[in-house]
């Protein structure tokens, strides 16, 4: 069998899991929607149908103080059971199991009635928590147990008690957030009392034939965080209190070390889980950046853990496990760890989806149905939008011919994949290459198509992308001026002193590329831990190395410039932008806003900064100043009476946006 460790059953005593895969908890935003139960039922059922052994729901609060935001989802009353039963019945009909995550967000709750062990404000929240009294703590423990009881009545197979990531239970555990002097604070035995009593109360309420997962923070990655000795002590106490499984938690939300984004190596933290092996007899789950069945199987086969948690990979591909088990791993749409359509959406109050799979969490809104009228369609441009349209339209029965002027598919993805930390884009291109074969798309590369050649098609989809915008600066045609395509696509030589005009996504990518000192650590776990100051020995509190970050300096002197007076990189993703800024600043890259450009000549780039004229004596000026749509074919086709659709950068080119491009291409393909 392929991946024998991954597909081995796991005996929990009172029940058996059919494989070693936990679909980790993700808040989708549907938990608060009026029709959320039906949409979540479809979302989870599709994953259960394709083999997930145990699904964990998005976080549900046990009471009003624990919600993530005002109006957040709770399970604290029997009247809410029918809503949840819709979900559990759908999962069970597909042969899966599902656990409800009980999440009290503590001082991370973004509403004015938040509570915590101590009245200490989180650095990522404007609200200050109320310090819980002894009586309130006892009531909270009962609220957790009540929530678990209601979950059982609603048909859930278990619960996950969320004890990591800096949420309430985690806040009781560390001196960073617990400054109490009563029985709930002080020494570690007191600080862990709340976590243990919650698990004990839940077990007493639900009986012995019900799964209790405890999500244990094994690596806090914050100052004054927990130690490994404390982790062992807590794990043993949690086992004694009645837990069934221990899941790994990595990093608090306020930590300034990346834990799930693309620059994090695959399986980067399974070594943390392995250190707990032998200290408890419960099955251990490891997590974070496990996006590939081979990586998962390797982790299990070498004994790092008993199960793997994969969350975002099931946004990217609901069929991940069934494809792996049936020998079709090359058809898996791999999670690239970008966060652009999942976490970044949740943090602005939108529904989760996935950059590489826009149907995720929208299954009921985007059904895949056979085409009513099969058409002969031309797609011009094999970038993200064109690829997404082509394979989805062909899967519905349309005859699709995909043209591209270049020698390989991918468009801007071929730029992105070269950026250190974005190597996962190779997987996306592998997926599209394979699906072109599977769906029967006719691919014509090295083919600059004309309007006349498109006359025979029923409709044309223009996904012809963008052309870089050339800003009106005197001397813009000077030999030292390069576009980002010259650098990233054509590999033009670049000197040691560089000015980058533009601080959007492309500007940051170009800076990451030009400032990279040697091999990227996104493929090297030890190197990654060293660069970001993670103590691999786990001897230091919080898992932080005494030496701190060791990000090496750039081999080039680079300055990034933008006209806007706002913070450079302000438009980058909420959950990943800080990683790029931190990395570049640590490498010595300068970022200057509010710049006026005067001219470019042999002396360099002439600018005005804070009212002062300066000459930046650089070897090269790299232009990353936006894009214009490439619509050359649109008007001739329209003039000839043909139906034309514009998608991707060809439609809107303000910023290169793969999330929008793939979603637009997919939606059109499902409608045409």
Curated annotation (Swiss-Prot):
FMN binds at residues 25-27, 59, 101, 215, 289, 311-312. The record marks 253 as: Important for catalytic activity, assists active site Tyr in protonation of C4. InterPro entries: Aldolase_TIM, FAD/NAD-bd_sf, FAD/NAD-binding_dom, NADH:flavin_oxidoreductase, OxRdtase_FMN_N. It catalyses: a 4,5-saturated-(2E)-enoyl-CoA + NADP(+) = a (2E,4E)-dienoyl-CoA + NADPH + H(+); a (2E,4Z)-dienoyl-CoA + NADPH + H(+) = a 4,5-saturated-(2E)-enoyl-CoA + NADP(+); (2E)-decenoyl-CoA + NADP(+) = (2E,4E)-decadienoyl-CoA + NADPH + H(+); (2E)-decenoyl-CoA + NADP(+) = (2E,4Z)-decadienoyl-CoA + NADPH + H(+). Induction: Induced when cells are grown on oleate as sole carbon source. Repressed by glucose. [4Fe-4S] cluster binds at residues 335, 338, 342, 354. Gene3D superfamilies: Aldolase class I, FAD/NAD(P)-binding domain, NAD(P)-binding Rossmann-like Domain. Its EC number is 1.3.1.34. Pfam families: Oxidored_FMN, Pyr_redox_2. The keyword Isomerase does not apply. Signal peptide: none annotated. FAD binds at residues 340, 385, 404, 412, 422, 449, 649, 656-658. Is composed of three domains: an N-terminal TIM barrel (residues 1-368) which binds FMN, the 4Fe-4S cluster, and the substrate; a flavodoxin-like fold (residues 369-467 and 626-671) which binds FAD; and an NADP(H)-binding domain (residues 468-625). In the N-terminal section; belongs to the NADH:flavin oxidoreductase/NADH oxidase family. PANTHER family: 2,4-DIENOYL-COA REDUCTASE, 2,4-DIENOYL-COA REDUCTASE [(2E)-ENOYL-COA-PRODUCING]. Monomer. Functions as an auxiliary enzyme in the beta-oxidation of unsaturated fatty acids with double bonds at even carbon positions. Catalyzes the NADPH-dependent reduction of the C4-C5 double bond of the acyl chain of 2,4-dienoyl-CoA to yield 2-trans-enoyl-CoA. Acts on both isomers, 2-trans,4-cis- and 2-trans,4-trans-decadienoyl-CoA, with almost equal efficiency. Is not active with NADH instead of NADPH. Does not show cis->trans isomerase activity. This is 2,4-dienoyl-CoA reductase [(2E)-enoyl-CoA-producing].
